[in-house]
């Protein structure tokens, strides 16, 4: 079972970080919320709409960066954004204006007419983030949005997400970078083995005088280490 008994209520307008070890169910949770994966039981609601009853309406409300990324490799970044604009019946001129601004902020302008299939992982991730923002959604669901993104672009992305949130948008993103979540988020969800261990405002989840990483390790447990193993790494051949 990838996820079981997950009961989450993420307030509108919040910046929520979803954290957990590899295989904890973060990606599955995001996929169920956005309608990419149907749960065996239970419901997912976005802005008061059931994801599986009002699928088209929910998709209009969401901007999603899934894992793995869902891009058309034979299209250029500029073509990909134009294609998404047509699918959403957006005004062509507005799509061009927004696309150029997004490509510029993501430092993709010089590569905008190259096929996405030739992009690095970080460039593909930035293209996906631009695509998620294009239609100005109300909620962003981002699976590891900063993975593989260079530090300069990461600062730009954080600035964009802060601006999106300050305008009333809701951001939910998964990450293994505890310091990043602690710096950006006001809410946090801690998962392990498909179960939600804690969820709520960051200030309440984080222990007194502890970092989020300290709290996370105390909840999830540190990986066991046997000092008798891997002695050869220190030059001890046994």
Each language-model region and where it sits:
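Helix-to-loop junction immediately C-terminal to a conserved catalytic motif
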Residues: 34
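Conserved ABC ATPase "signature" region
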Residues: 82, 86, 93-111
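Conserved catalytic motifs of ABC-family nucleotide-binding domains
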Residues: 136
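Catalytic Walker B motif of ABC-type/P-loop ATPase nucleotide-binding domains
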Residues: 140-143
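A short, surface-exposed alpha-helical micro-motif characterized by mixed small hydrophobic
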Residues: 181-182
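ABC ATPase "signature
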Residues: 199-200
